[in-house]
């Protein structure tokens, strides 16, 4: 490969202090001569050094006879028969003694793959693009050659006050910046290393720079602040490192990074480390790096998940995610550790706060202080709380054992991130579970994720109330079994008395209270997942009713049977069974109870369901509601134009992002008129004229429908509107089926 070119070997061999490094370099050259590195192994100056190619160019591959390929005379520092470990030993690479000593004191005695791949081209002065995953030793990969150069260049400069930095390391987050600073300080305590980032005192960092510094590590935003304030001078920077460059893009630092690069000396050496190569990173390398060598230890292989991870995917609306999240954790984590991944810091805070009412949780993101971060991680590891809500950036590099459940609250940016997130569970051969939340507009992305990762999701519905109660009880029982016997003896008297009084109900009451269900749980819609709503299924036998069965038929049925139900009906979806005419829809719990007790027209069956049947999905590819995307407020405060309570024409407010897709075939236009196709979306406000056999419908701002002109009320709502639709028994207009003279 290009990293092992003869100029690199010449540089290494010309350094009288690099005895061990000369041996390693000469060994690589000899391996090439023996044919181990064929045509692609040593290539053009900007060729790619891959993991596979590097394995063929190991710095110390044993021969079968136990003797190295050069014999015993290759170098005085080389001993025949020594294997890879000895050749890659830190002590044998010609590094300064003080650097070797500090590394060995930290237990670092050998190079990792990324470190051995970077070492020679970095010492050669090449610009580099290195692809390596998080946690593979990238910091020392660029740290070792830079520290070596700084120490060997020292002419008393290191102790000079007011010196400007020779090394600049840019990191996307303060967590990573502090980690890099720690690595460099521990490896080279003699060098002046300063870490700068936002959220802390500007003056403290300014004073540290004014005293003189060799290495500056920081986030782009604070670096620019210090440059603009005249506190940071970059005119003598010799080495630039962009660590996790792809994450710079993810957190919005691309413009800041380019601003900084434009102010650096042209003759600097630049090293860019990135797990992925988005277009911005490629553009950056073309513009600001000089004929860079690419070292790729990731490759183009598909990301794969560890075996033993069960994958689920659940379709939700944006607003229903938080409602369903706690139930998913209760049912699938079974009291174990859960990590919920969000994209933004704001989401992490809000999700954690929403969970706190039912499940102990903490947030982890870049705005949290280092002290709080460590406190949070220790508490999670020790089981003081069971749910950690984290952003991708804040969670990079974390090592937390025994995580039972991963929830992707938002879709990851790429397959690698999905694998990285999900890989937090199912470690060391243990079983684990990962659940992906997605909206209807993200279905294609989910399919692409399955293809790219090579996995298959099991698509699930939100847990039912019964499943949540059962799982909660099991968790409480497991907790009770862990109570120390010495503690229970103080409560035996009260327990016996209560058991005599209530029998098994005493224990049941205790389980309910400890599970957080002192009051009966309210119903929840299977469609919108909102509490206080019930999902019903209407089935009509063949031969009953007129025309095609459609959501319009459902609204007509409800208008004739119960005007209050028609006035409050939510979204309507047709079932997918071709042999049965059916639909599902939402109603407020109290209205649904009354409707289920009413007499229905012949051939119609109405039931409360606990699981959605297969539904027709022939709606538009988008789930935008057009003009209705922003005009729906809280459902409890909504009012129809006719004055009655309404669910916003069957739509659901989803924060303007991913709106729950209508079951119909067309979107509403930006006017107040409705077409027949609009009716197929279902859930329209029922202060309108409609019935089973009706051929026309019009939107009315009048009051709620009445039965044959009679005044009726439900829940305090008055209905005094005359009926102008058509009877579904005889098809004639002007009366309802309940008033039909032919019934």
From Swiss-Prot:
Protein name per its UniProtKB record: DEAD-box ATP-dependent RNA helicase 3B, chloroplastic
Pfam assignment, any one: GUCT
Family to which this protein belongs: Belongs to the DEAD box helicase family. DDX21/DDX50 subfamily.
Zinc fingers typed CCHC-type, residue spans: 725-742
Provenance organism: Zea mays (Maize)
Gene3D superfamilies reported for this sequence: P-loop containing nucleotide triphosphate hydrolases, Zinc finger, CCHC-type
Sequence ranges of Acidic residues compositional bias: 61-79
Source organism superkingdom: Eukaryota
GO biological process: chloroplast organization; Group II intron splicing; ribosome biogenesis
Amino acids binding ATP: 132-139
MF-aspect GO terms: ATP binding; ATP hydrolysis activity; RNA binding; RNA helicase activity; zinc ion binding
Lineage of producing organism: Eukaryota, Viridiplantae, Streptophyta, Embryophyta, Tracheophyta
Primary localization: plastid
Annotated compartments: Plastid, Chloroplast stroma
Segments carrying motif DEAD box: 243-246
Q motif, short sequence motif: residues: 88-116
Catalytic activities: ATP + H2O = ADP + phosphate + H(+)
Domain Helicase C-terminal: 324-469
Stretch forming the transit peptide: 1-37
Keywords: ATP-binding, Chloroplast, Helicase, Hydrolase, Metal-binding, Nucleotide-binding, Plastid, Ribosome biogenesis, RNA-binding, Transit peptide, Zinc, Zinc-finger
Swiss-Prot/TrEMBL domain comment: The Q motif is unique to and characteristic of the DEAD box family of RNA helicases and controls ATP binding and hydrolysis.
Keyword check for Coiled coil: no
Biased composition (Gly residues): 642-653
Compositional bias per record (Basic and acidic residues), positions renumbered to this chain: 657-671
Stretch list, region Disordered: 60-79, 606-719
């Amino acid at each position: 490969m290009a990293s092992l070119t003869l100029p690199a070997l010449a540089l290494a061999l010309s350094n009288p202090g690099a005895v061990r490094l000369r041996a390693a370099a000469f060994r690589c050259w000899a391996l090439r001569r023996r044919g181990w590195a064929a045509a692609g192994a040593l290539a053009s100056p900007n060729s790619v050094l891959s993991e596979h190619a590097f394995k063929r160019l190991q710095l110390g591959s044993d021969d079968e006879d136990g003797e190295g390929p050069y014999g015993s005379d290759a170098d005085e520092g080389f001993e025949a028969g020594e294997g890879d470990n000895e050749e890659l030993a830190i002590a044998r690479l010609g590094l300064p003694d003080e650097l070797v000593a500090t590394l060995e004191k930290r237990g670092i005695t050998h190079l990792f793959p990324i470190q051995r791949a970077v070492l020679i081209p970095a010492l050669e002065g090449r610009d580099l693009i290195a692809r390596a995953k998080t946690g593979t030793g990238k910091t020392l990969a660029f740290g070792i050659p830079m520290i070596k150069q700084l120490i060997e260049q020292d002419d008393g400069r290191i102790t000079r006050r007011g010196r400007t930095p020779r090394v600049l390391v840019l990191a996307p987050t303060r967590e990573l910046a502090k980690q890099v600073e720690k690595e460099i300080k521990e490896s080279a305590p003699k060098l002046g290393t300063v870490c700068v980032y936002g959220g802390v005192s500007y003056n403290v960092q300014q004073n540290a720079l004014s005293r003189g510094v060799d290495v500056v590590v920081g986030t782009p935003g604070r670096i620019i602040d210090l440059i603009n304030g005249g506190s940071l001078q970059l005119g003598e920077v010799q080495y630039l490192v962009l660590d996790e460059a792809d994450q710079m893009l993810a957190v919005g630092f691309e413009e800041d990074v380019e601003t900084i690069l434009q102010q650096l000396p042209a003759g600097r050496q630049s090293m860019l480390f990135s797990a992925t190569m988005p277009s911005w990173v490629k553009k950056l390398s073309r513009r600001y790096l000089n004929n860079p060598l690419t070292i790729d230890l990731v490759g183009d292989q598909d990301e794969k998940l560890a075996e033993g991870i069960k994958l689920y995917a659940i379709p939700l609306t944006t607003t229903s995610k938080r409602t369903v999240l706690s139930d998913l954790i209760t049912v699938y984590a079974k009291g174990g550790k859960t990590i919920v991944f969000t994209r933004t810091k704001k989401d992490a805070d809000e999700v954690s706060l929403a969970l706190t009412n039912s499940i102990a949780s903490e947030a982890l993101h870049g705005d949290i202080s280092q002290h709080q971060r460590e406190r949070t991680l220790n508490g999670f590891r020790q089981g003081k709380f069971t749910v950690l809500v984290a952003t991708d950036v804040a969670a990079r590099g974390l090592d937390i054992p025994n995580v039972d459940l991963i929830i992707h609250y938002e879709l990851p940016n790429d397959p690698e991130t999905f694998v990285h997130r999900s890989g937090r569970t199912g470690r060391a051969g243990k079983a684990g579970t990962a659940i992906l939340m997605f909206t209807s507009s993200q279905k294609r992305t989910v399919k692409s994720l399955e293809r790219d990762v090579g996995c298959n999701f099991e698509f699930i519905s939100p847990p039912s109330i019964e499943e949540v109660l059962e799982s909660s009880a099991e968790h409480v029982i497991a907790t009770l079994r862990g109570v120390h016997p010495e503690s229970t003896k103080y409560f035996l008297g009260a327990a016996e008395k209560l058991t005599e009084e209530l029998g098994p109900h005493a224990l049941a009451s205790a389980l309910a209270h400890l599970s957080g269900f002192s009051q009966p749980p309210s119903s929840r819609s299977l469609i919108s997942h909102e509490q206080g709503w019930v999902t019903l299924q209407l089935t009509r036998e063949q031969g009953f009713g007129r025309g095609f069965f459609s959501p319009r038929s459902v609204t007509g049925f409800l208008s004739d049977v119960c005007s209050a139900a028609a006035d409050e009906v939510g979204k309507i979806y047709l079932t997918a069974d071709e042999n049965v005419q059916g639909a599902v829809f939402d109603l407020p719990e109290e209205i649904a109870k009354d409707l289920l007790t009413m007499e229905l027209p012949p051939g119609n069956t109405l039931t409360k369901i606990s699981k959605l049947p297969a539904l027709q999905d022939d709606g538009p590819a988008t789930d935008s509601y057009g003009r209705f995307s922003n005009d729906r407020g809280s459902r409890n405060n909504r009012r129809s134009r006719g004055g009655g309570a309404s669910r916003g024409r069957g739509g659901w407010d989803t924060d303007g992002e991913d709106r729950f897709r209508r079951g119909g075939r067309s979107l509403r236009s930006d006017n107040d008129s409705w077409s027949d196709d609009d009716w197929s979306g279902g859930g329209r406000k029922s202060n309108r004229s409609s019935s089973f056999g009706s051929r026309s419908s019009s939107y009315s701002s009048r009051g709620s429908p009445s039965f044959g002109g009679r005044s009726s009320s439900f829940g305090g709502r008055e209905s005094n509107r005359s009926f102008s639709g058509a009877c579904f028994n005889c098809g004639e207009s002007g009366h309802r089926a309940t008033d039909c003279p032919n019934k």
